[in-house]
Amino acid sequence: YDTRTLKPLHPQYVSSVDSGNLAGCLLTLQAGLAELKDQPVLPANAFQGLLDTLQVLVEQLPPSSTADLAKKLKLLQDALTPNDPPRTLADADRLLNEIQRIGGGLVTWLPAEIDIDGELYYWAQAFDQQFRALRDDLGYLAPELEQFSTIPTLAELATKGSAYKDAVARLRTIDDLAGRCHELAVMDFKFLYDTSSGLLSIGYDVSERRRDPACYDLLASEARLASFLLIAQDQLPQKHWFALGRLLTSHGGDVSLISWSGSMFEYLMPQLIMPSYHHTLLDETCKAAVSRQIEYGRQRGVPWGISESCYNATDMNQVYQYRAFGVPGMGLKRGLGEDLVIAPYASALALMMMPLEACRNLQTLAAYGFLGAYGFYEAVDYTPSRVLRGKRHAIVRAFMAHHQGMSLLALEHLLLNQPMQRRFLSDPLIRA
């Protein structure tokens, strides 16, 4: 789609894998919305989130900062690190009032000459906005605090009479959004299924009104989320799963499935919401794929992590070009060794399989200067033909929303005990 007009770009095309990913994410979002009803209106980690933002702000503090500002930040840190989080709404309200008293409007305490585009101003503004949102939401949902001996759920608030009409309205909004997710997730994929091969076509060309003759024929593919979901919904027969190719490769004693391009995306993207079962072929494949990526990076003397991404070439509009890259020996595609493009989001995906190794690699990427204001840069191109003479690499200074989003999902998979997998599996058809 044209991002300015939202009109479909030509050729108009219905992608099987993108549609499957969308349907799976909509069902996961629907389950996440349903959870909001029975969660405390003040999440247990709300004040920890404020403290995290404050600590990032403190890290940006220059040595020349005023003593008053440093003292204020220290008082805020002390207030946000109690022995126990607030146990009642009244306790939470008192803590919010204390934060307001100590440091309400942190931005106003910054030096007059501060760079408003700098990190210090950004994080001070983020803290102020985060604090106001928390305080305003609590006041909106629970105007009468003292009658609760614990922190109630949204559903409990909605039963407490007319004073809590906004909680009732919030529940209606949640139900409306969940219903829309369900409706949008109901997609008919049957016209994309090739009955003769038992495989899913890669898509449908709307302009030519024909199904694409090419099919997704490998289990180690980003399309397996669509396959899994459609079998669960009885849109495709179970035999489709077993029609997916299971060509094997081995390296260093590890056996794994072969993908088309040997990219981290093909192996790990579906795991962002799909369940993983230890000691299965897919689980062992994903681990082996990460191990091989680590080894290949070591062999080439670069940080590891190769996937589909932008690279250091632009079109006439100075837009970075994009395609799949991978590790030789892991993919069927020819010429995988001709390019060397490292995508930081590939390391983020690997957090789900090998968290320690992935974390170390992300730290290395940051130390090399590949971390920008909005996260890690899209890619680092080490391909000699695309690097200036005398330089070893070229940074692709772009940020792609879907790669940043995948990175966030991989982080929450690791840090929050796989909530997306739990939500995805809460759908009765998928659970069955």
Give the positions of each predicted feature:
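Ser/Thr/Asn(+Pro)-rich, low-complexity disordered segments
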Residues: 1-432
